[in-house]
Amino acid sequence: LKPGADFSYNRTTGSRSAANGYKEAPVIINGKLEPGSGGGVCQVSSTLFNAVLLAGLEVTQRTCHFSPVSYVPLGRDATVAEGVIDFCFRNHLKHGVYVYAEYAPGSISVWILGNKEDKPSYVDISKTKEETVPFKTVNRVDPSQKEEQKTEEGHEGKNVTVKQSVKWADGRVYHDLFESDYEAVDTVITYKNKEDLPKE
């Protein structure tokens, strides 16, 4: 990636179809796991996002998931969706860089390789804000369901800010902030009979 050039994750990885070699795996849709072609690509884009942060590159487009993910620290994920959501960054360094990624069973690694003059002398990636968004319990009635009572567990949301601070030996400095708003999901309890609803 030459100096001043932009990297697009979606453009680089191409259409996530079976014809292009992508397999079906779980994908997160509206906060729920569902099977889809290319499931798991967000783990690669999130790992790349963290490598970009540590290399001191400039992130130009990044979106968090609907809910926090387990494979990167809170606020340091980058979701992608073909034709809708991309992860992009720019090489604003003095020299070109290479993006090298490697897969091994159970792990993904991404390196940003380049000129030693562009290697930061100081990097700090830290949370500057973490707020909890509460969730509610919602009771409903559905006479058509088989179960007497069905519960869909919810979870709290999070509002997080992560700061990227980078310094180079020649005096250059770079800072950026990344906001992540993870939605709260209400617990929904559905009863077959209206008479079973809890009394308020």
Locations of the language-model features?
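Well-ordered beta-sheet/strand-loop patches within structured domains
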Residues: 1-200
